[in-house]
From Swiss-Prot:
Residues 1-25 are annotated as: Disordered. Transmembrane segments: none annotated. NDH-1 shuttles electrons from NADH, via FMN and iron-sulfur (Fe-S) centers, to quinones in the respiratory chain. Couples the redox reaction to proton translocation (for every two electrons transferred, four hydrogen ions are translocated across the cytoplasmic membrane), and thus conserves the redox energy in a proton gradient. Belongs to the complex I 51 kDa subunit family. This is NADH-quinone oxidoreductase subunit F. Keywords: 4Fe-4S, Flavoprotein, FMN, Iron, Iron-sulfur, Metal-binding, NAD, Quinone, Translocase. One of its GO terms (molecular function) is NADH dehydrogenase (ubiquinone) activity. FMN binds at residues 166-213. The keyword Ion transport does not apply. It catalyses: a quinone + NADH + 5 H(+)(in) = a quinol + NAD(+) + 4 H(+)(out). Its EC number is 7.1.1.-. NAD(+) binds at residues 54-63. Residues 16-25 have a biased composition (Basic and acidic residues).
Length: 421
């Protein structure tokens, strides 16, 4: 369990103002110049030592990603913050943008300095109008105080931060599709290699990080890498914001230590499952893209490695709780429709496969199918998985795989009852 003094996001629920004056009282922008004076290498190494892994879903080492940037590039370098949070069940970045904007902006300055980028872009989801307004106000305050811009914090380093609003496409949450959109093109993922660190925004070296990944950096540098590494578990260090929704008594966002049990999270912070733990049917533990877990596995620890071992993933930390009243087949079919709608259409397996999977899923919802089609559907998900430019194909396949793995008997019973009728 996370101690109160170890929390990074002390205004996560917006009890206090998010303006500069209030943010400074909570510790933001405290002697930022001293952190910059320690140099680029110090910041990168400290973030590496902390064990911080990307909070957007992939879980790649943040410090390692920064170290891929060229030291003396002839081209300008860029930092891009992915605030295009569109994953169903996920709203952690939204609350950072709403209530902790200065944590993000200070993190942008420190990360930009670490990778040698004089320009940073915050790409925010188009629907986040109020959040974009909050960020812009915070940017205006920071510019006015000399915290960013020319000679940021009197450090001799110039850092301009720009806010760019997207247009509501889920695919633009994929880092290279985001870059395409930022350049004014259609948001479609790029083939990799080349990777963004070598050929990113406008063909220049670029690092793309999630909002939460950047927002925790100032606190890590102030308190030290060993402090952050001491929270959680080895290889799964630090704190994480979890979004708990669905059939719970008190849906909420909460910051907790990595490795906390899923059951403890739900019972301590969300008031427990509606109707009690025995009424639980399944949980999606990391946003809609990861396979669900049946009740039997729902006491798993919430970290990258434990959830992978359990056959799912931490993803974004978006916990969707489903009680026994849930039509589990229809719930996953609804996710299939989402991925069909959000596919950019660039890759044939995803373009054709997502629609095909949704149509089969809707027949399974009614029971109007043959039992052999369950295995046929499973085989198609495996043909899509790993055969697309980006991970949207995987994201569409995994929920169905989880459903068939854990609830095949329920699908078969639905088919049997339909044939009897």
């Amino acid at each position: 369990m996370l101690k109160e003094e170890d929390k990074i996001f002390t205004n996560l629920h917006g009890q206090q103002s998010h303006d500069l004056k209030s943010s400074k009282k909570r510790g933001d922008w405290e002697n930022t110049k001293a952190l910059l004076d320690k140099g680029r290498d110090f910041i990168v190494e400290e973030v590496k030592k902390s064990g911080l892994r990307g909070r957007g879903g992939a879980g790649f080492s943040t410090g390692m990603k920064w170290s891929f940037m060229p030291k003396n590039s002839e081209k300008p370098c860029y930092l891009v913050v992915n605030a295009d949070e569109s994953e169903p069940g996920t709203c952690k970045d939204r609350d950072i943008l709403r209530f902790e904007p200065h944590k993000l902006i200070e993190g942008c300055l420190l990360a930009s300095f670490a990778i040698g980028a004089n320009n940073c872009y915050i790409y925010i989801r188009g629907e986040f109008y109020n959040e974009a307004s909050n960020i812009q106000r915070a940017l205006d305050e920071a510019y006015k105080e000399g915290l960013i811009g020319k000679n940021a914090c009197d450090s001799g380093f110039d850092c301009n931060i720009y806010l760019h609003r997207g247009a509501g496409a889920y695919i633009c949450g994929e880092e290279t599709a985001l870059l395409e959109s930022l350049e004014g093109k259609k948001g479609m993922p790029r083939l990799k290699p080349p990777f963004p660190a070598g050929f990113g925004l406008y063909g220049c070296p670029t690092t793309i990080n999630n909002v939460e990944s950047i927002a925790v950096v100032p606190t890590i540098l102030r308190r030290g890498a060993s402090w952050f590494a001491g929270i959680g578990k080895p290889n799964n260090t630090g704190t994480k914001i979890f979004c708990i929704s669905g059939h719970v008594n008190k849906p909420c966002n909460v910051e907790e230590a990595m490795g906390i049990s899923l059951k403890e999270l739900i019972e301590k912070y969300a008031g427990g499952v509606r109707g009690g733990w025995d009424n639980l049917k399944a949980i999606i533990p990391g946003g809609s893209s990861v396979p669900l877990l049946p009740k039997l596995l729902c006491e798993v620890e919430m970290d990258f490695d434990s959830l992978r071992t359990a056959g799912s993933g931490l993803g974004t930390g978006g916990i969707i709780v489903m009680d026994k009243s849930t039509d589990i087949i229809y719930a996953i079919a609804r996710l299939s429709k989402f991925y069909m709608h959000e596919s950019c259409g660039q890759c044939t397996p995803c373009r054709e496969g997502t629609g095909w999977m949704w149509r089969v899923m809707m027949r399974l919802v009614k029971g109007n199918a043959k039992k052999s089609e369950i295995d046929e559907l499973l085989n198609v998900t495996k043909e899509i998985e790993g055969h697309t430019i980006c991970a949207l194909g995987d994201a569409a396949a995994w929920p169905i795989q989880g459903l068939i793995r854990h609830f095949r008997s329920e699908i078969e019973a639905r088919i049997k009852s339909y044939s009897v009728v």
